[in-house]
Amino acid sequence: MSSLRLTFWGAAGQVTGSMHLLEAAGARILLDGGLFQGHRAESHRLNVQLPFDARRIDAVVLSHAHIDHSGRLPLLVKEGFHGPIYATPATRDLSAVMLADAANIQEKDHEYLERKGRVAPESEPLYSLRDAIAVQDLMVGVPYRRVFHVRKHLALDFLDAGHILGSASVDLRVSENGNHRLVYSGDIGRSGLPIVRDPEPPTGPIDTLIVESTYANRQHESFDQAETRLAEAVRRVASRGGKLLIPAFAVGRAQELIYSLHRLSRAGQIPQIPIYLDSPLAVDITTVFRMHPEVFDRAERFIVTTNELFDFPLLHYVRDVSESKALNSRNGPAVIIAASGMAESGRILHHLAHGIGDHRNLVLFVGFQAEHTLGRRIESGQERVRFLGQEHERRAEVESITGYSAHADRDELRAWVRRLGGPIRRAFVVHGEPPALEAMAAILREEGVRDVRVPSHGESFEL
């Protein structure tokens, strides 16, 4: 067999920045091209320069549209990449919106800090809107369960990862001078979540497995428990006239929250207070969701019996900046859902700046908060937090709900591995903080995988 090499250029020893370089069948294939997030100076250092010549990459396989998996694709194009980017149709449509938004946020944040005289190297935009738009010209939509030849001896199959709309596990088969099967899990979702279908793992013998580990050392509450706690949070904030501030990923999490609040409102389980989705990106993403009902979970009764999942009387979509600003001076209780999910950018920063000092308010986290992010600092209970160039005293209540996580927990990851069925020759564990990486490695060994590695950044392996 010709040489097979795998190099880990992101999400190795940490959660963000997913990017893995596969050299096979005479081609150089990039599995994801994600942005590092968190500690700004360190992330900027890792993001600003690609560790290879972009012009020598033949193709990209994109597992899903989250920025920590797709956010460096415009930089790749900026640096000279012009090959195909393979993704599911829903991922293609989501990334069109999300990458343009990422470019806009970088440019606007830089302009804001420039006006304030607080420009730092890490605030320089990585790429422009033009670069983000150029990515879409290279996108090739590949439906689930349709084998597609990336090269003559390299076949690709996408299976539903159940993580977000369009997310996929990648099944790659190299047939040059022999056979080698590589499976990249992407981000594995949970069973029983609304809207998207349950994860569908590839089955049969696997030579090389690359698997995520985000929550391999944790156990989530159920979705029903999460909805109950969400209802309690809404009622508690309403009773004291405060605001429920929810940093939420614009794709997936925002729509799941709308789904839950719709169900709770219809069932009379929450007070009739206004709910604002204050994120132009999330509004656009919701439009993309409406475009792809073919990937919804038709086993979910509320989906089947509801004509319009994403519209109900309490819900208001906010696009206009002036309307967003007006929410901060609005009297009375309200729910405000805004991106970004880790409170690193977007309108949630301005809502936190105005609301984190008010004891009536509640900051509710419904997703993973990576190390060094503002979300992690608030979630961990810091009484003083610095963002937008100023220090803020936290008086607002803080709570976290894990049941909305789009990542499989310990037991769900173990079940996913078991459902693979066939023997696994070797496995690489990525996309986790050190305790989770080690927990996932232990799960794999317990399930009979003898060769388990936890690669470090830049580490390369002959397969």
Where are the regions that the model predicts?
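Active-site neighborhood of phospho(di)ester-bond hydrolases with catalytic His/Asp-centered motifs
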Residues: 31-33, 57-66, 73, 85-88, ...
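Acidic/glycine-enriched edge-of-secondary-structure segments
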Residues: 33-37, 58, 179-185, 189-191, ...
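Hard-cation-handling environments
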Residues: 230-371, 445
